[in-house]
Amino acid sequence: MVSEQSSNRSHPLDYYMDNQSTDHHTIAEDLEMQLTENDKQRIKSISEQIEPLNHEGLLKYGANLQQKMSHFSHQILDDVQSKDMGPVGETLSQLMGKLKSVNPNDINPEKQSRLKRLFKRTKASINEVFSRMQSVSSQIDRITIQLEKHKDQLTKDVEFLDQLYQENKTYFDNVSLYILAAQKKKKEILTETIPQLREKAHQTGNQMDIQATADMEQFVDRLDKRIYDLQLSRQIAIQTAPQIRMIQNVNQALAEKIQSSILTSIPLWKNQMAIALTLMRQRNAVSAQRSVTDTTNELLTQNASMLKKNAIETAAENERGIVDIETLKTTQNDIIETIEQTLQIQEDGRQKRQVAEKELNELEQDLKQHLLSMRK
């Protein structure tokens, strides 16, 4: 049905997604408006399969579609249950912990403790931080590999859910045709068959003719109930569509956040840490140079003025362009905030999946009850 529509006409199920409408008649009217000639031929063919007074045939009418819907619901439920996003949250928590483990203040001499500066352990401290940063960087690289795997799995899940969404559309189309075919047959019996039977019974007064009319009316009542059951199944398909999209959107948002961490946040953190270490080493180099200049100044009194001037100018030039540590801290805080937002999205996704799982279980039980009642 969908493939034969022109590109500028939306599927009724997509219209429902856009307008969040549960108006059963509106969806049915939209469906009838979009019927192609092939659809009309299929409706006619399906309608002709309904044999009046064939109660067993009526019982089986559309049952294969409903069984497919039951299997389809199982697929979605299994997917929701099997995709535990816990490892994603744990991996992101590990990443955030590693980013916090290296404090920019540790490589800023001005913010070190007085005791540490008193014993002149600045150089040793920087080396220690550099060594720790290398270790953390290696650990972050390993975490990045895990995040890549999680992102790939989330992307595959989105594609799988999209396939399920298309299958749900196909089911919606097929069950809608069965509903229209049954309604067509019902109208035919009410407007043609029953009036003829009533006329015959009125003319003959034969009890068997009267019973035949009553049997046909009873068949119409059962047919009407069968139509209602199929409409319930179609409503399940309508409600399933936004649930699939909800899970898809959460997975997609989480995958995008992971990609942002991998491609932007982590490289930026590494670059900024490397820059900070380089600048701190330059600061130490300037300090050492100043000491050498002072010593030389004492030994060579005749060149004291010139050496002092050169030392000051050199120190001034070397001091230019040093990045503020506060900027580095702000950058790191932004990185951590990004990861925290990702964790929040993951938590929201878990809650939404739990809601979806509960609703799907209820829908499945409802469908099973109708199937069981249909077989009685």
Swiss-Prot record:
InterPro entries: Toxic_anion-R_TelA (IPR008863). It comes from Staphylococcus epidermidis (strain ATCC 35984 / DSM 28319 / BCRC 17069 / CCUG 31568 / BM 3577 / RP62A). Belongs to the TelA family. Signal peptide: none annotated. This is TelA-like protein SERP0976. It holds the Pfam family TelA.
